[in-house]
Structure formats: structure tokens, C-alpha cells
Amino acid sequence: MPPPFVVTLTTSAQNNLRDQLKEKNFIFSQPQNTVFQARSNTVTCTLYPSGKLVIQGKGSEEFIEFFLEPEILHTFTHARVEQDLRPRLGVDESGKGDFFGPLCIAAVYASNAEILKKLYENKVQDSKNLKDTKIASLARIIRSLCVCDVIILYPEKYNELYGKFQNLNTLLAWAHATVINNLAPKPAGDVFAISDQFAASEYTLLKALQKKETDITLIQKPRAEQDVVVAAASILARDAFVQSIQKLEEQYQVQLPKGAGFNVKAAGREIAKQRGKELLAKISKTHFKTFDEICSGK
């Protein structure tokens, strides 16, 4: 794990940091002798009354390079990522942990070094580091450069498939294998595919690819979104998720908060009360514990 990163912020930078971390859905608390502590799955930011900011966590280097320096400190001193210019395919998903809305799976095929250089030049990175407006603009660039495929499983279809597979990782493997198969060159040659290892066993996704008779080398690893092509796929998946949520909100005239926290459960209760459980089932992932709790009045 990288060592802690320490920097002193001005008052305006502190306020800017707090606002932007809230937009990124960091979880806030206030341990003793701090102004605040904000956490994501990979980064912890602790701000002290002196203005000292301490950043820790396995995702701290990427957080500093792609967010803190350009957006808060307005510097660019952190080490650059070495460019990997090998043609490859990346795949990622969005919406897996969101109660409302679809599961979106995207694949991106960067077929040559020039395309890859442009992805690096445009600072393509893990969508979790980006605001939704930045995601939308990068998604347009990625679609103009790369061959792309996106599957959007709206809740009704998602729930149907979950009923068939009875396991989220098996469903994810089927969806990942589908977009990989759709984009993989035939024959694949030296082109390979990269995916996050979302299941305990690498065999879960490999088995799904074998069923489709997809002949391509597959690399599965934790935090695969550090790779620029997987990051591009994460951006397309997130962009599709955000647009799909908006579409559902317009179609059913409801507000659908992202995530699976207290505000999401409160919104679900209100929808079930005002519009019925049948509508709730059309716009949410019904295997979530949240759905049963809402329907049982907990």
C-alpha cells in the first residue's frame, strides 16, 4: 500500500475538496481532532484544523494524480502512469451496487498505439474518480476513438436474468463474456482482454467465455480499472447507467437516488406507498435486501 500523502490546504481548497468529495459519494465522519474524514472503498481523506490533509489507501496514488492535483491543488507533480500501448480490450460494469436502475456492462477495444495514446492524452481514468459531467464528455471521446459495446440490463430484464442465474457473479460473467465476445477480433492474435476479477474464482468468467467459444487471452485482476482501456469501459458503463437512471425517472416521474443507502431506502418506501410495489419492482433490483425490507415495512 502506498505511504500516506500529506499536504496543507488553503481554506478555499478545503471547501472545494469537501464539496467535490460529497459529489463523489464519499462517506463522511468526524473523528476527534479532525475537521472531517471522508472515505471511499479505496481512499481515506482526513482533514485537520491546521489545514493538513492526509490521504491513505490502496487507491491514493490514482486519486492524487487524477483528482487532487488537477482539481484541488492545481498542480501536476505526481508521477505519470507508464503508457501501455499494446492493443487490447477492456470491460467493466456500473450499477452493480445500486438498488435503483440497470446493470450496465461496457467493453472497449483499443486496436492500435495511436488510439491508446489519445486515451492517455485525454486522461481517461476510473470513472469513480470523475464527476458525471466529465464522464459524459470523456464517453463521447472514447466512442469516437474506439470500438465499443454496451449492454444495459434494465431492472425488469435484470430481475428476470437474476432469477435464471440465481447468482450475481454468474450473471456478471455472462454479461462480461457477451461484450468481450462481441468485440474480440477473430482470430484474436496478440489482442487480449482485461477484466476486474469480480468473483472469488477466475474460472467463473473463463467458463462463461468458453460457453461462447471466445478464443482470446483473458487477464483478470483486482483494480483492473487502473488500466486505461478498462477505465474507458468503466466510463462508458457509468455514462450508460446515469443516462438510464434519467430515462427511468422521466418515464415513471420518480426520483431515483443512486447507491443503496438510507436515502435510497426512503425513496423506495415512498414509491411503494404512493405508486405501489409493482412499480418498485420495475425500477429496482428485487434481490436486494432493501426490496424485501421495503415490502415488509421494515
UniProtKB/Swiss-Prot annotation:
Please tell me the species this chain comes from.
Chlamydia pneumoniae
Q: What is this protein called?
A: Ribonuclease HIII
Q: Quote the SUPFAM superfamilies the UniProt record gives.
A: Ribonuclease H-like
Question: Which protein family is it in?
Answer: Belongs to the RNase HII family. RnhC subfamily.
**Molecular-function GO terms, alphabetical:** magnesium ion binding; RNA binding; RNA-DNA hybrid ribonuclease activity
Q: Tell me which InterPro entries the record gives.
A: RNase_HII/HIII, RNase_HII/HIII_dom, RNase_HIII, RNase_HIII_N, RNaseH-like_sf, RNaseH_sf, TBP_dom_sf
Cellular localisation: Cytoplasm
Q: EC number(s) for this protein?
A: 3.1.26.4
NCBIfam families in the cross-refs: rnhC
Q: Which reaction does it catalyse?
A: Endonucleolytic cleavage to 5'-phosphomonoester
- Domain RNase H type-2: residue ranges: 86-298
Which cofactor names does the annotation list? Mn(2+); Mg(2+)
Which superkingdom is the protein from?
Bacteria
Which residues are listed for a divalent metal cation binding in this entry?
Answer: 92-93, 196
Query: What gene name is given for the protein in this entry?
Result: rnhC
Q: What role does this protein play?
A: Endonuclease that specifically degrades the RNA of RNA-DNA hybrids.
Give yes or no: UniProt keyword Lipid biosynthesis: no
Pfam families, sorted: DUF3378, RNase_HII
Q: Which UniProt keywords apply?
A: Cytoplasm, Endonuclease, Hydrolase, Magnesium, Metal-binding, Nuclease
- What broad taxonomic lineage does this protein's source fall under? Bacteria, Pseudomonadati, Chlamydiota, Chlamydiia, Chlamydiales
Q: Which GO terms describe its biological process?
A: DNA replication, removal of RNA primer; mismatch repair
Cofactor binding note from Swiss-Prot or TrEMBL: Manganese or magnesium. Binds 1 divalent metal ion per monomer in the absence of substrate. May bind a second metal ion after substrate binding.
GO terms for cellular component: cytoplasm; ribonuclease H2 complex
